[in-house]
Amino acid sequence: MSENRAPIYLDNNATTRTDPSVVQTMLPFFTEQFGNASSAHAFGNEAAIAVRQARRSLSGLLGSAYDHEIVFTSGGTEANNAAILSALATQEGRDEVVTTSVEHSAVLALTEQLAARGVKTRIIAVDACGRLDIEAFRCALGPRTAIASVMWANNETGTIFPVKCLAGWTREAGALFHTDAVQAIGKVRLNLKDSTIDMLSLSAHKLHGPKGVGALYLRKGTKFQPLICGGSQERGRRAGTENIPGIVGLGKAAELAAERLEPERIRIGALRDRLEQGILRNGECVVLGDIRNRLANTTNIAFDHLEGEAIAHRLNRAGIAVSLGSACRSGSMQPSHVLRAMQVPAWRMHGAVRFSLSRETSLAEVDEAVCAVSDIVTRMRASSRATVREQTS
């Protein structure tokens, strides 16, 4: 590898680079069009118009029936919390939550807290490929279910869940259905108006938008109790002065994603496959997750009997950014809860490394990464074999 080349970023499921055109769209709203959208003067009117346009753009990406079904938030975590807590507060006579064992910590940490308060949570298992036990999900729904919350796509393996089918069964049971679509947004077509999904969470920074802003899709007619109280912003559904630059950035990011989604999905999928094939040629490694139904940008590769942390560290020193899983659990010494739920053996689980691409990833970067991984893994295995020989001689 050339010592002068630019760093290679393959951790796009953690966050993405804000698109330069998104930044340019945001800039005037810091210093020129800086009004409060609730103010009754020209500055406020400019801000209000910008928010309406962003709402329209995001509604278009989601395929929602009405622009006002979009509620802007500080991000996916807030949206997840708002959806689940609202369902428990508004679904009279229903006090149970159904979710899965592989959800993001923004959902699982909340359900653990709710369980400590006496709220019954039914956790549905997945199989060795990370696919949901569909029959167990259907059986878990009942007259006391307030909400079922299932992610659209897993952030660690990319496995896609059949959320539209799950939403239909949930509605038949009289409960609300929520999906955490933070990883899916901008990568798959959602078309919410053709579904029975009641609520959906998303975050701007996963689709080349700014950090600190997201949204909750709230289907028209769905009862909702705000998580944050105060002013009447967002039709009384989320109090607080709107983050106008962030909302504008999210709107622009949504426009770009809608324009490029299908061609980029195909291109990125081909690059992901090339990356996988190049790495798998080294042997003693395997792709984790559902390889037939996953996000085009994501691959989680386990290097048998090696430490993924050591591989990621060496790649970082070589200027290549990857991760072991969710950045939100970075620093934790516990193995991935997703891989544990999939019952991946310890000798394989500890060698897992996630590679996640974006529309900015190039063919040259993928080939460079394959060479770097191959070199690092070859050296680590040679060192391991030498150590074994020394110990047995």
UniProtKB/Swiss-Prot annotation:
Top-tier EC class: transferase
Claim: Iron is one of the keywords in the record: yes
Names of required cofactors: pyridoxal 5'-phosphate
Disulfide bonds: none
Annotated [2Fe-2S] cluster binding sites: C328
Annotated signal sequence range: none
Active site location: C328 (cysteine persulfide intermediate)
Keywords per UniProt: Iron, Iron-sulfur, Metal-binding, Nitrogen fixation, Pyridoxal phosphate, Transferase
GO biological process: amino acid metabolic process; nitrogen fixation
Catalytic activity: (sulfur carrier)-H + L-cysteine = (sulfur carrier)-SH + L-alanine
Keyword NAD: no
Modified residues (N6-(pyridoxal phosphate)lysine): K206
Binding site for pyridoxal 5'-phosphate: G76, T77, N155, Q183, S203, A204, H205, T241
GO MF term set: cysteine desulfurase activity; iron-sulfur cluster binding; metal ion binding; pyridoxal phosphate binding
This enzyme's EC code(s): 2.8.1.7
Similarity-based family: Belongs to the class-V pyridoxal-phosphate-dependent aminotransferase family. NifS/IscS subfamily.
Known function: Catalyzes the removal of elemental sulfur atoms from cysteine to produce alanine. Seems to participate in the biosynthesis of the nitrogenase metalloclusters by providing the inorganic sulfur required for the Fe-S core formation.
Assembly: Homodimer.
Family annotation (PANTHER family): CYSTEINE DESULFURASE, CYSTEINE DESULFURYLASE FAMILY MEMBER
Protein name, entry field: Cysteine desulfurase
